[in-house]
A protein has these predicted regions:
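Nucleotidyltransferase catalytic core that binds NTPs
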Residues: 1-179
Length: 179
């Protein structure tokens, strides 16, 4: 199938979802890929706004995108709003710290401080053109012993990192080099 056809199907599914599934945003997300293969298109970010979605936290829906294999990674900024990774990372120096951040510890922050000071010593790296990312993988989110993701635990970590003024990435990258 061509990319145009796939986008057309996603568009029709989105319109259908807006009319008939607006009260169930998670279900609406899954319906976006009805009648197309997940490898045909990737949804990098999603943002539900408006009076019908006041109780929806877009960070949870971003997590759903990664969990359902619709994208490999999602990001949100210190304000808790979703970010489009391609837009915010384009032509940036990237310093990524991977961890579970359950909770954020002094060791995590010391690693970040030490690595950033080393990173900025490179003459090609400009601090104001650098994006610092705290990455949590799906594996880290599932490491609670049950194999399932505890959404309240995820939200607690996300809120803590955002309150610290940090940019958060949730990814399905098992290997660090893929990040």
């Amino acid at each position: 199938r061509s990319q145009q056809e796939s986008l057309g199907v996603v568009g029709v599914n989105l319109i259908y979802g807006a009319f008939y599934q607006h009260d169930r945003p998670r279900k609406m997300l899954r319906y976006l890929f009805d009648h197309i293969d997940k490898s045909a298109i990737e949804i990098d970010t999603i943002n539900f706004t408006g009076p019908l979605f006041e109780d929806v936290d877009n960070r949870i829906l971003s997590l759903e995108l990664v969990k359902n294999g619709m994208t490999e990674a999602v990001m949100f900024g210190p304000d808790g709003n979703n970010l489009l990774p391609a837009r915010v990372l384009y032509k940036k120096n990237i310093l990524a710290i991977r961890g579970s951040f359950r909770p954020v510890t002094n060791v995590n922050m010391d690693m970040f401080t030490s690595s950033s000071s080393l990173f900025y010593q490179d003459e090609d790296v400009e601090e104001d053109n650098t994006m610092n990312i705290f990455e949590i993988t799906l594996s880290n989110l599932r490491s609670n012993g049950t194999g399932f993701i505890d959404e309240q635990d995820f939200m607690d970590r996300a809120k803590l990192l955002c309150a610290m003024g940090l940019t958060v990435m949730i990814s399905n990258f098992k290997e660090y080099y893929r990040l």
